[in-house]
Amino acid sequence: MNVYIPILVLAALAAAFAVVSVVIASLVGPSRFNRSKQAAYECGIEPASTGARTSIGPGAASGQRFPIKYYLTAMLFIVFDIEIVFLYPWAVSYDSLGTFALVEMAIFMLTVFVAYAYVWRRGGLTWD
């Protein structure tokens, strides 16, 4: 149990700092309210419930579909983000893992490369 005391102290200090920061900001900071500050923010798009027009395309109203290129870009980001999540711990502990882990990572990287090549050949990386 004595091993975890520094971690618990650090967690308590982090939580206390967060609470104190929020309390001080709410007491000292300006509190000018207006309608645009209270509205929901949906990635630069007007909220779907207002029926207002958006800036995604000419004449596009909220609730309509938007170009698939945004979806593809987000999915590619997630794929490569997850790749890094798996690649970093493997690289850190590579010395102790051996050849089997090298083969596993090579297969994983090959799979990601094939997916990348597929998206590239299908035109998912062009913004026309």
UniProtKB/Swiss-Prot annotation:
<comment type="function">
    <text>NDH-1 shuttles electrons from NADH, via FMN and iron-sulfur (Fe-S) centers, to quinones in the respiratory chain. The immediate electron acceptor for the enzyme in this species is believed to be a menaquinone. Couples the redox reaction to proton translocation (for every two electrons transferred, four hydrogen ions are translocated across the cytoplasmic membrane), and thus conserves the redox energy in a proton gradient.</text>
</comment>
<feature type="transmembrane region" description="Helical">
    <location>
        <begin position="5"/>
        <end position="25"/>
    </location>
</feature>
<dbReference type="GO" id="GO:0030964">
    <property type="term" value="C:NADH dehydrogenase complex"/>
</dbReference>
<keyword id="KW-0812">Transmembrane</keyword>
<feature type="transmembrane region" description="Helical">
    <location>
        <begin position="100"/>
        <end position="120"/>
    </location>
</feature>
<keyword id="KW-0813">Transport</keyword>
<dbReference type="GO" id="GO:0005886">
    <property type="term" value="C:plasma membrane"/>
</dbReference>
<comment type="similarity">
    <text>Belongs to the complex I subunit 3 family.</text>
</comment>
<comment type="subunit">
    <text>NDH-1 is composed of 14 different subunits. Subunits NuoA, H, J, K, L, M, N constitute the membrane sector of the complex.</text>
</comment>
<protein>
    <recommendedName>
        <fullName>NADH-quinone oxidoreductase subunit A</fullName>
        <ecNumber>7.1.1.-</ecNumber>
    </recommendedName>
</protein>
<dbReference type="InterPro" id="IPR038430">
    <property type="entry name" value="NDAH_ubi_oxred_su3_sf"/>
</dbReference>
<dbReference type="GO" id="GO:0048038">
    <property type="term" value="F:quinone binding"/>
</dbReference>
<feature type="transmembrane region" description="Helical">
    <location>
        <begin position="72"/>
        <end position="92"/>
    </location>
</feature>
<keyword id="KW-0472">Membrane</keyword>
<keyword id="KW-0874">Quinone</keyword>
<dbReference type="InterPro" id="IPR023043">
    <property type="entry name" value="NAD(P)H_OxRDtase_bac/plastid"/>
</dbReference>
<dbReference type="GO" id="GO:0050136">
    <property type="term" value="F:NADH:ubiquinone reductase (non-electrogenic) activity"/>
</dbReference>
<keyword id="KW-1278">Translocase</keyword>
<keyword id="KW-1133">Transmembrane helix</keyword>
<dbReference type="GO" id="GO:0008137">
    <property type="term" value="F:NADH dehydrogenase (ubiquinone) activity"/>
</dbReference>
<keyword id="KW-0520">NAD</keyword>
<keyword id="KW-1003">Cell membrane</keyword>
<dbReference type="Pfam" id="PF00507">
    <property type="entry name" value="Oxidored_q4"/>
</dbReference>
<dbReference type="InterPro" id="IPR000440">
    <property type="entry name" value="NADH_UbQ/plastoQ_OxRdtase_su3"/>
</dbReference>
